[in-house]
């Protein structure tokens, strides 16, 4: 008896379905036997508002004479500090760093001549304060310092969350509960139960701007935005009862 050309694909498809069913049945039976384990990843996210601002301002002066450049930079740093205090920041929140000097050499036809033509001195003033909103307001108007004749180059403020160490534990606990819930969904259909924790691997924390989907394998810490999402990830291996 000859086999119709249309019956062969149907037979193969039927065999594949039966094979898949057998594989699924074996997997379910293995879970039901107990002694197996399941590894799942859980995560938890918490929305936070930055509670610490770090703002650095570089006061730069340039002169042929190194001493003159150093004095001009120091005077500018003092004026910058006074302006910050007058704006409402406590003096204790402000730090003036040691000056950094750069020597400027003369170049002719792409080569240095060895002759010193000037000195560039930079003194950094750093603000570290919980007054996040005030720093954001001051940083939004850098012309206010330039209008005073202060040769300052302000950097973008960094917005941090100082209480991050305090919430790491609770966040990982929530992530562990999330992992257990995922495991229960997976093994529940097989009539098995999730048992004790056998192994835990804590992942990196992601501190991102609010509602961002950006992640990094090495963790990330967004400092540009005041409103952030902090996500903790944990990989848990459970015994299956």
Specify the residue positions occupied by each region the protein language model found:
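Short, charge-dense linear interaction motifs
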Residues: 1-241
